């Protein structure tokens, strides 16, 4: 919007309303279409401006922690910075867990914490804490804005600070940005004469054309230097081509274009003749026909020592897969490792001989010659092992009539509608997806919070992913659900569809798989943390439909089709001890395989 339309969006009643409306208009021109606001008095000028802007949807959320994870889900879905507003005091502290997740996993958030002016700090004015650099080193950038003042230079300063904050949330790599916003009274949109020195600007019909002319939405992403044709002449490419015992590790990934990502990995694998060990949280398993060298059962295959499968070189795409067996194998084999990740972070917890290459796989694949390398004996060993393990695993799961949490992950890959966004909760669900999710071509879009791997904020993040998106499914355990049950309040504002598959095993099933499970009586209350919540009543309290699913056939009917609008909970009762025993038995079976595969 330009000209007179823009003029009508600036609120000249007082300095705070003008400050807020310039902030909102600048954000709108940068491309902002949705913001999350938490109630509070000190933040009223920001909330009012965002709520009044015709091109920004300001979504209210009472619980700041839930609101922040909701904004994180919106950022995952839109890949744009999401403004997140709160009042002064402890409110901003509740944003911290989601902000850490955004920093660790690389999602853009623009946190706006309203604050009291300097003269009301450190004097017990009430609802006041030290908010400057509240989030430590986690933000991409952080600053405290100046107090609103009645001069053109101050207005231009505000505009440019918002532009810079938006850009720093996106470049050079996405992440959170924090602006602390001090405001004096009046906080309500009442005329007080404070903008009188600016009346000449208000009356100037050309003001908006000149003031906002430099505010444009950033187009495209800044790519690392190197160009598209560098790879085939780079020294690392020559070293890769000289290795017959190499593997590509595809860890958790949420690329903007999953098919392009899958095609790039396949091109690299074919050119080198290397197998691709693909994590269940990678899109590769859902574009399986693109890559004949895809390996999905590596966790089972590596349960025992298998030197025939040990690589000499590894290309690691981003973070390592979750698999403990894989990590133990890499720690033993100590392969030469090449980390492909544009972020300047140490992503090698094994401390192997690793070289960091600051590129994305799409860039590397574009610079290598097309073609297919000769299939080595090492590649053939991996492919034979995968074929046998995949067939046996599929048979075991297909023949299983009762509920088993691992089968649910396998079953969803066969039954979810194509291209369904699937949010996968941390703890047991992500591991079952890695262990059991089969290769397929349904182009399902996995979403997850694997920056810090916690169970906090799962419901709220899933609501954000589902907002104005395709019908979305959340796969979660009972403790993750309860940990964020305050997020159920978001159901009343959801524009979209979210189906929650609630695995209720009455506690923390992941601990049944750990050595602590053998520790004796302290295990149940302190680790398994059993619960007896009536989820039907909990859902009823929030006006959310709840249904207990008893059979696989009933589940298939409930998911075909997914509803176009609304929230519902489908609860599945499982036995965490029996399921843990089954997983351990299957792992034991594979660990006893002979080393000559």
Swiss-Prot record:
UniProt entry keywords in alphabetical sequence: Magnesium, Manganese, Metal-binding, Thiamine pyrophosphate, Transferase
CC cofactor note: Binds 1 thiamine pyrophosphate per subunit.
EC number: 2.2.1.9
Cofactor dependency: Mg(2+); Mn(2+); thiamine diphosphate
One Pfam family per UniProt: TPP_enzyme_M_2
Keyword Methyltransferase: no
Pathway, per record: Quinol/quinone metabolism; 1,4-dihydroxy-2-naphthoate biosynthesis; 1,4-dihydroxy-2-naphthoate from chorismate: step 2/7; Cofactor biosynthesis; phylloquinone biosynthesis
An individual GO BP term: phylloquinone biosynthetic process
Coiled-coil regions listed: none
UniProt superkingdom: Bacteria
Family: Belongs to the TPP enzyme family. MenD subfamily.
Subunit text: Homodimer.
Stated role: Catalyzes the thiamine diphosphate-dependent decarboxylation of 2-oxoglutarate and the subsequent addition of the resulting succinic semialdehyde-thiamine pyrophosphate anion to isochorismate to yield 2-succinyl-5-enolpyruvyl-6-hydroxy-3-cyclohexene-1-carboxylate (SEPHCHC).
Stated name of the protein: 2-succinyl-5-enolpyruvyl-6-hydroxy-3-cyclohexene-1-carboxylate synthase
Native source species: Synechococcus sp. (strain JA-3-3Ab) (Cyanobacteria bacterium Yellowstone A-Prime)
